[in-house]
Amino acid sequence: MPNKRRFFAALLTALSLLSAWALAEIDLKPYEIESDRFTPVEILAPDMYLVLQDGSLNGVKQPTALVLLDHGQKVFEQRLPEEPSDDPHISYSLFVADENRYGLRTFDNSTYAACFQLLENGTLTQGFSIEGYPHFEPLPNCLCRLHRQNGMCFVERFDWDGILLSSTPVSEIEPTPYSGFTVLDDKSIAYIAWDINVSQDQYRLYHLRVSHDGKLLSSVPISLPNEVFSPMGAFSPNGGILSYTDAKLAGLREPYFSFLACSDTDGNLRFTKSLKAKNINLSVTQAVLRNDGSATIYGTAERSSKKLFRVFKLELDASGQILSRDVRDFTTRADYQYTVKLDPLGNAYVVTENENRIAIVPFEDLPVLDDIEFMLE
């Protein structure tokens, strides 16, 4: 009888521990920063954040300002002009080229002029303005702009003093602003374009590379699933391209999955694959592509109805096979909207987006919970 009592006592203890573990919630308070819901934040390095405090989000309880936080302390703050709510024409955003070049972009909707100001040595520079189409890509050595003129598309490169370095004509298929583009060491440009015509049931993506004078070097056509979101892209230093986009089956709201396509610098398609998990929404949000075609992808896996909230990191080889996986739990006291972001040094963080105080959690701080069966096919 004593042995039986000890057995049941041990069983109850194990069950209570298991229940406590299953209901454990991650405390985000140590990771919260002073912010409002959907406040723009850029991660510069561990515990260093560039924050755009927007008075319109908090009823001007806190003034619109550019703030630099270092380990939770404000080391820089500059108030910005408030816009009248009945006639706004100025918008602010943040930009980061690398760990040393970052700052504020101010866009004037009435003149289509964008002003870029770097934050250097505790001072916001006077900056420079560029007029025209408002889609820019900040890179360590230059600022790129997608420019349309007289029915043609150009990628223009400016140095960080605002001086035009080059203007490269690109394909008639317009580069999508949200897919990204990059300038390689030989001044050629790699970029992603998509060509979607719903009436003709045509869904295509292109990985493109052009020389500095606009000569087409490679074009890789890729068929897409018929319901996709805006594709994003990662580029290797030698011009390889990895595009990724959320997708779903026609007519279904959930679950959605991620569609991946990778090509090399010579315009050869390495693979196209769909990353899925049964009854779970998967979204790739960040990727790093290397010269040999291997890649690291980060993303979220969630299903609110199942109270399943995870983030993941997958290592892929050049053929798109999963070499290793790292899945972390992100169960919190509320059903947050969250994403995975990288800083310029390559460190990964989980960032909440829909709470009054944004939390930025280093990926490595989250508990391992590998309970997802990934399918990459």
Give residue ranges: language-model regions.
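Short loop/turn motifs that cap or connect beta-strands within the blades
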Residues: 26-36, 77-85, 127-132, 167-174, ...
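Short glycine/acidic-enriched loop and turn motifs that connect beta-strands
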Residues: 55-60, 107-111, 149-152, 195-200, ...
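A short loop-to-beta-strand structural motif that recurs across blades of beta-propeller domains
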Residues: 63-67, 114-117, 152-156, 204-208, ...
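Blade-level signature of beta-propeller repeat domains, shared across WD40, Kelch, NHL, RCC1
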Residues: 336-377
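Bacterial N-terminal signal peptides
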Residues: 10-20
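Repeated scaffold domains used in trafficking and secretory/extracellular systems
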Residues: 35-44, 85-97, 130-140, 174-184, ...
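An edge-strand/N-cap motif at the start of beta-rich repeat modules
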Residues: 22-57, 72
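Entry beta-strands of beta-propeller and related beta-repeat scaffolds
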Residues: 47-50, 100-103, 141-144, 187-191, ...
